[in-house]
Amino acid sequence: MKNGNISAENKHALEFLFPINGDVVNERDGVSSENGIILTVKLIGKPDGEVYVNNIKAANKNGRFTANVPVSFYRSVLVANDIKNGETTEITVFYFSGAVKKFRLSSDDNILFLKDITVNKDKYSSIFDNPYLAVYKKAHDLYGAKVHLNLFYEVDKEAASKFNPSPEGFNLSMTTDKFRNEFIKNSDWLKLAFHSKSEFPDKPYLHGTAKEITADYIAVNREIMRFAGKECISDSTTTHWGAANRECVRALRSLGYRSLTGYFEKYGDEFIVSYYMSDKMCEHIGERDFYYDLSEDMIFGRIDLVLNERSYGEMFEKLKKIVSHPHRGGFVSIMIHEQYFYPSYVNHLPDFEKRVLTACEYLYKNGYSGAHITEVSEEKHLKDNPLFKKKHTGLKTT
């Protein structure tokens, strides 16, 4: 038996073209039904084949097969059987029923706002007296944004050199715990997570070890627990540069992370912020909201737009295209980097706040509501289909 993963077209092997093994689907991928969605499943096989998918006969156009198959459960197995040629293949797909018309705002490379809160702990009466966090509070209060901040453990020398004055010397262990209760109070919409030890070196986990990433995670997570409470900790993150080999991803999964986000987008000659994924898989994930890598039990989410990468006008035009995209516009993930907020940073963006608020406003006015990845990827009321706890033959029954 063969699993339905992306491969070169083979007219003599029964293979799923859409969805593929590990695909996450939602209402944008099919037609809504009373109990879920109807997917138009596409396969390739022998031209003379007679194929059934979960007991539903597929139409055959010279070896290209389509079948309208209901998907109603969080996890479903699709079994295709060519009863004429004796070929069978199956895939597992996931249905995130609450992942349409949702958006997420995240930020990477965070640490400096915590230094400011610590330095001003006797002056500030709230964490939102910090100007940087105040931007996200506005995004939440005005547009319902749910915000996710990925943290460095320390400000390294090279990163500090890009600021004037330099913020070198600060690490999370210095963060005040005075505002712990306020972090907890706002933890329904404001989440914190491990990013990496520091900004440099780049891509620390691309060739890293489980021991290294675990040590860095422990250092960051211990301090988040201390100054913000376990309620603020997210089970999703983006590792620094979205680069991590399988060993490091396995370590993160064992530590409790359920999802990782990245670009899965080509810059020049290579895909970046794409973890260990092959170019072929990056091409696929880059056109989806989510993908579930069953081999590592890890969900991968597509970051749709990095707010600090383009001019304001280009950013806004790209956001419009994403919203209208048939397979990326269900759950829209927007992201920015903390350092661009500060006038002391060499690449400061004076319109940082405008970019964040305008993007959130546009999504809100187009019917989107804020959500954390955990909220849309949890099984909740959707249970594994009991029909698939036993081997499904894929044969039509009478």
Where are these regions (language model features)?
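Short, compositionally biased P/S/T/A/G/V-rich stretches that sit at domain boundaries
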Residues: 1-33
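C-terminal domain-boundary segment and adjacent tail
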Residues: 259-264, 334-398
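Active-site beta->alpha N-cap acidic-glycine motif
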Residues: 90-181, 233, 334
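Short coil/turn motif common to extracellular beta-sandwich-like domains
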Residues: 32-40
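Metal-dependent polysaccharide deacetylase catalytic core of the NodB/CE4 family, i.e.
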Residues: 146-245, 267-271, 334-341
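Surface-exposed, short loops/turns at beta-strand junctions within beta-sandwich domains
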Residues: 68-75
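Active-site-adjacent pocket scaffolds in enzyme catalytic domains
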Residues: 116, 159-174, 178, 231-232, ...
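Short proline/glycine-enriched turn/loop motifs at strand-loop junctions of beta-rich domains
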Residues: 43-49
